[in-house]
């Protein structure tokens, strides 16, 4: 037992025993209600004066309004403290205010201790708003010229918040300034900076200025402007402002299925994440499509982006993308666009040379381009992979080069044609046709017109050889008998030219006969036959004749084989009796047949004419000689100087 030494008056005083008397109103096992005390008798006295029906005076109204305003301000201040404590800003990086954050974390009052008075800095506020907003990381700035400092207990405190990082602590003295209205307080946080800035009148000018401030160069140095939003392009440069940092981490994977090349640069500023990206899409897109796509991926409005195609002809722009792709500030995936490689890679730079007209002429000759418009258009499309075509586009004399190229190509083609015989020319024209064809539709059509095929072959043989008095064949008959269709298909296969009497008022209407193997005069009327009977008898004979040429001297030529179509049968006209012996006439009396679908029954195409001349070459005396059976051993024409190959 414990020692009780020193204890007096056992059982008495504060250390003694005490009695507790309990009053039990219910017996064991009786249910107890969960409601309020059932024993209390409700007399209704507690509801007396529940409704304040006293007379309201003017002074009480003002007091109540003041109380409501003070309670609203207190609630608002509590909510703002919670926001600054728990919410993060999606627009502003914490690095934007690192200096001020460190000061406030070390000591909330350290920033207020000043040994000398700081000069007032005049700041020009371009964009202001009267809204009270908060983003968490942003600063709450009171719109006054100087910060109001209030001393309490001998310690000065700054009136501005520390960027949302400094918070009041319990037990410390707090300064409660007077409640300012919304018109006197502006909260310029990261969110409000973006929203206020982008609500200004000229958004594009603001975005261009911010881009130049962040990257140190103008956005227009990298792009060329498209005035229309519907113009499509394969490559696009996009600058996006106010992107959330969580989106920036996943953007590369989100954009990958849509593009084949991506050059991504991220930069953090006071607005948040700034994106600069060069994209090459799998298909051509216009500005509206690109804006909708990126607005969905980046979760920003479309007017927060600058979207333009890149400068593909600027070496400065190409060098910028090339140099930045080598740094760790860029994320580059995919094959480098050819316009960047062409202007930056050493091999491409060495391949660039001055324009050579001979290479352009050789290309036009090999591809049978003699028209200026075709030469200009087709050669310009080769600039992506042909250095000479690129030099052609960079030249200021493109029109002159195109004209000279077409002229030289025509000279080479005419010289080549005049050097060939008719047999060689038909063989040359047949090589340009890949299809085999069938010769029977041509024979069937001649039989349909009641023309003896053997007689037609004998006349055609003399016509191809240019025999005097047999140098002109006339196809006559009623309309819609297939005269023009038959002759046009033959002239097209032989690469001939077509002359028209409608130009007879000009002295030069016969000039095309100087540079052709065969010719066609379509739809000769009485006036045309009369002109031929008066002035062109020597021409129809196949004898030499002088032809007037524009800007050139007269040319003495032998008329090429000539086809004439007409609705007039000159063999029945007495006045054309001097043409009877000079013109071979074939009559087409029957209409040209068509099936019920409107297609020609007898197909007269180049492939069928190729088969026709190949099948009947022996009858037409155009068969290759024995020396030519082994193929053409002559070298292809070259107008570009070659290099001498030294043999070992």
From Swiss-Prot:
A motif (Nuclear export signal) lies at residues 106-115. GO terms for cellular component: host cell nucleus. Residues 153-188 are annotated as: Disordered. Residues 186-352 are annotated as: DNA-binding region. This is Replication protein E1. Belongs to the papillomaviridae E1 protein family. It comes from Pygmy chimpanzee papillomavirus type 1 (PCPV-1). The gene is E1. Can form hexamers. Interacts with E2 protein; this interaction increases E1 DNA binding specificity. Interacts with host DNA polymerase subunit POLA2. Interacts with host single stranded DNA-binding protein RPA1. Interacts with host TOP1; this interaction stimulates the enzymatic activity of TOP1. It catalyses: Couples ATP hydrolysis with the unwinding of duplex DNA by translocating in the 3'-5' direction; ATP + H2O = ADP + phosphate + H(+).
């Amino acid at each position: 037992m414990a020692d009780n030494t020193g204890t007096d008056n056992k059982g008495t005083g504060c250390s003694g025993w005490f009695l507790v008397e309990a009053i039990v109103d219910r017996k064991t096992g009786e249910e107890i209600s969960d409601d309020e005390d059932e024993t209390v008798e409700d007399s209704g006295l507690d509801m007396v004066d529940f409704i304040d029906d006293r007379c309201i005076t003017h002074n009480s109204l003002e007091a109540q309004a003041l109380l409501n305003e003070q309670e609203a301000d207190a609630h608002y201040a509590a909510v703002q403290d919670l926001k600054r404590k728990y919410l993060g800003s999606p627009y502003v990086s914490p690095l934007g205010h690192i200096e001020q954050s460190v000061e406030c974390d070390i000591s909330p009052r350290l920033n207020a201790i000043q040994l000398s008075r700081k000069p007032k800095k005049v700041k020009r506020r371009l964009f202001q708003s009267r809204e009270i907003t908060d983003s968490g990381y942003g600063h709450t700035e009171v719109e006054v010229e100087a910060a109001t400092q209030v001393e309490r207990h001998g310690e000065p405190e700054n009136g501005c918040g520390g960027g949302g990082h400094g918070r009041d602590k319990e037990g410390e003295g707090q300064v409660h300034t007077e409640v300012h209205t919304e018109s006197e307080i502006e909260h310029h946080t990261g969110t409000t900076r973006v929203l206020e800035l982008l609500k200004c009148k000229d958004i594009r000018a603001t975005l261009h200025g911010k881009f130049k401030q962040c990257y140190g160069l103008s956005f227009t140095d990298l792009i060329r402007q498209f005035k229309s939003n519907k113009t499509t392009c394969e490559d696009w440069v996009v600058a996006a402002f106010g992107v959330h940092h969580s989106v920036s981490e996943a953007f590369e994977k989100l954009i990958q299925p849509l593009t084949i090349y991506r050059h991504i640069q991220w930069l953090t500023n006071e607005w948040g994440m700034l994106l600069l990206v060069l994209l090459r899409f799998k298909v051509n897109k216009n500005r509206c499509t690109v804006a909708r796509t990126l607005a969905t991926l980046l979760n920003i409005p479309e007017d927060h982006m600058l979207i333009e195609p890149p400068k593909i002809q600027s070496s400065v722009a190409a060098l910028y993308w090339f140099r930045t792709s080598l740094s760790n500030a860029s994320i580059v995936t995919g094959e480098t666009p050819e316009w960047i490689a062409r202007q930056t890679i050493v091999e491409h730079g060495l391949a660039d040379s001055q324009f050579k007209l001979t290479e352009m002429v050789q290309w036009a000759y090999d591809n049978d381009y003699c028209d200026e418009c075709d030469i200009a258009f087709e050669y310009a499309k080769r600039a992506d992979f042909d250095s000479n075509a690129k030099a052609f586009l960079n030249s200021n004399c493109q029109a002159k080069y195109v004209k000279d190229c077409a002229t030289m190509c025509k000279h080479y083609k005419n010289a080549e044609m005049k050097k060939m015989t008719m047999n060689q020319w038909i063989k040359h024209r047949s090589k340009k046709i890949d299809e085999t064809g069938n010769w029977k539709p041509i024979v069937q059509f001649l039989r349909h017109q009641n023309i003896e095929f053997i007689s037609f072959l004998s006349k055609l043989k003399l016509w191809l050889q240019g025999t005097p008095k047999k140098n002109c064949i006339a196809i006559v008959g009623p309309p819609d008998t297939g005269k023009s269709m038959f002759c046009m298909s033959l002239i097209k296969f032989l690469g001939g030219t077509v002359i028209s009497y409608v130009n007879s008022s000009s002295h030069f209407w016969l000039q095309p006969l100087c540079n052709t193997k065969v010719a066609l005069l379509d739809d000769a009327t009485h006036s045309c036959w009369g002109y031929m009977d008066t002035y062109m008898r020597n021409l129809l004979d196949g004898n030499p004749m002088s032809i007037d040429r524009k800007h050139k001297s007269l040319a003495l030529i032998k008329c090429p084989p000539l086809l004439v179509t007409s609705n007039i049968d000159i063999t029945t006209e007495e006045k054309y009796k001097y043409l009877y012996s000079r013109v071979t006439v074939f009559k087409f009396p029957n209409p040209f047949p068509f099936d019920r679908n409107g297609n020609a029954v007898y197909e007269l195409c180049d492939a069928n004419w190729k088969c026709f001349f190949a099948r009947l070459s022996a009858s037409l005396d155009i068969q290759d000689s024995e020396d030519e059976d082994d193929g053409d051993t002559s070298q292809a024409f070259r107008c570009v100087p070659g290099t001498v190959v030294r043999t070992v």
